[in-house]
């Protein structure tokens, strides 16, 4: 379990401890959240946060960089080994800033970006109009087919018609495997760069639980906190020396200043953990758990987007299945200490603030040791809560008791830790 901390600032100390208590005592099913190891958290809260060091190892604009240079080099070498790739930049502050760096390095303002429609599982930074990617570049969308799967022939037709400069594959709510080789064929036909945004599935790729984009995508971006279980941060990978040089120039001095060396150290620790044999076992269990979890709902007649999952997440169409919107479902479940997030579904008729879907993921609770049996229990509880719609005081008490037993039996430091 995450330990209590004591600061001189009692107000902040109390709030941090309350948040740690919340994490310890609730079921976490948000697909983009996970539990970093104590080593990662410790590395992220060290004196390294005091150090400034604009530039790259051996080429800094500040003195006193002997040790931070070594740390950044180690992080780079570890992540290159993890993904079997030639070049890596570990300085991006987030996944979105990593994407911004790629766009700035490879595109001109107004160039065309082709990405999955946001409602269908795309991401804001893939060309959505209210995001920088849609403000400074021309965002074009592709969609899922009638089975809610990627239709590569249809994507190719859109690409041939619109001639994008960059095609993005990699999503925030798509539950099926991605054919990176097919995407590269499409990109080559229109002379476009192919960007694989693997923020959600990076850990699964590293562990061999999802096909790798290495060798197909010109460039790869990721976060480090989701299935990789590292600190909050970004990452850029490529096998192209030319692209790597452009990326380095854009990350610094183009869009960022001094790197967060405390975070880079924590990334290095997470990369080392992901290279351990137990991490492959952990990611395999994530996928098993997600498949089993989704199947439990399908058995109950609940509609799952694309009728299943091959990765770590899936989305329930709560509007058609329970006559609830995603916001209502999220609030209901939080009232019994089960944390989820509302999510749009393909062709959603409701706003992103309401949604027709509820996204569920297995990485965090798999970190705590949940296996198929526990996810069967979760499906029973969630289905009961959403069917009832309104819970009385006794029902809330009983469900909270069940959740408490599960969180007590599976504390944060229960399984799959170094």
From Swiss-Prot:
GO CC terms, sorted: cytosol
Biological process, per Gene Ontology: glycine biosynthetic process from serine; tetrahydrofolate interconversion
Catalyzed reactions: (6R)-5,10-methylene-5,6,7,8-tetrahydrofolate + glycine + H2O = (6S)-5,6,7,8-tetrahydrofolate + L-serine
Entry keywords, A to Z: Cytoplasm, One-carbon metabolism, Pyridoxal phosphate, Transferase
Residues bound to (6S)-5,6,7,8-tetrahydrofolate: 118, 122-124, 351-353
Cofactor: pyridoxal 5'-phosphate
Broad class of enzyme this protein falls into: transferase
UniProt key word RNA-binding: no
Residues found modified as N6-(pyridoxal phosphate)lysine: 226
Binding partners and assembly: Homodimer.
NCBIfam families: PRK00011.1
Descriptive protein name: Probable serine hydroxymethyltransferase
Gene that specifies this protein: glyA
């Amino acid at each position: 379990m995450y330990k209590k901390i004591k600061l001189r600032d009692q107000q902040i100390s109390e709030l941090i401890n309350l948040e740690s208590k919340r994490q310890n005592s609730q079921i976490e099913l948000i697909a983009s959240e996970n539990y970093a190891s104590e080593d990662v958290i410790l590395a992220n809260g060290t004196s390294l946060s005091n150090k400034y060091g604009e530039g790259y190892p051996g080429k800094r604009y500040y003195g006193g960089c002997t040790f931070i240079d070594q740390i950044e080099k180690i992080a780079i070498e570890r992540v290159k080994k993890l993904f079997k790739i030639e070049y890596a930049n570990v300085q991006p502050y987030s996944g979105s800033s990593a994407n911004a760096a790629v766009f700035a390095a490879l595109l001109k303002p107004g160039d065309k970006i082709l990405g999955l429609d946001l409602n269908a599982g795309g991401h804001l930074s893939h060309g959505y109009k209210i995001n920088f990617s849609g403000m400074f570049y021309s965002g074009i969308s592709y969609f899922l087919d009638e089975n809610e799967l990627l239709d590569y022939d249809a994507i190719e037709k859109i690409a041939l018609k619109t001639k994008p400069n960059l095609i993005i594959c990699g999503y925030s709510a798509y539950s099926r495997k991605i054919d990176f080789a097919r995407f590269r064929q499409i990109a080559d036909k229109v002379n476009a760069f192919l960007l694989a945004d693997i923020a959600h599935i990076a850990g699964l790729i590293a562990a061999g639980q999802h096909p790798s984009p290495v060798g197909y995508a010109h460039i790869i971006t990721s976060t480090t906190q989701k299935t990789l279980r590292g600190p909050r941060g970004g990452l850029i990978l490529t096998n192209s020396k030319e692209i790597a040089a452009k990326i380095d120039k854009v990350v610094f001095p183009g869009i960022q200043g001094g790197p967060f060396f405390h975070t880079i150290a924590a990334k290095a620790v997470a990369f080392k953990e992901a290279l351990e044999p137990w991490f492959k076992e952990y990611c395999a269990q994530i996928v098993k758990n997600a498949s089993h979890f989704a199947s439990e709902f399908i058995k109950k007649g609940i509609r799952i987007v694309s009728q299943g999952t091959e990765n770590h997440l899936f989305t329930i169409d709560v509007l058609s299945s329970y006559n609830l919107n995603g916001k209502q479902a999220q609030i209901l479940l939080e009232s019994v200490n089960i944390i989820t997030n509302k999510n749009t579904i393909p062709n959603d008729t409701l706003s992103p603030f309401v949604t027709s879907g509820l996204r569920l993921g297995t990485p965090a609770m798999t970190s705590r040791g949940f296996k198929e049996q526990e996810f069967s229990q979760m499906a029973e509880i969630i289905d009961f809560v959403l069917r009832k719609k309104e819970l009385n005081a006794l029902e809330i008490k009983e469900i909270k008791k069940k959740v408490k037993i599960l969180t007590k039996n599976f504390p944060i430091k229960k399984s799959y830790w170094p």
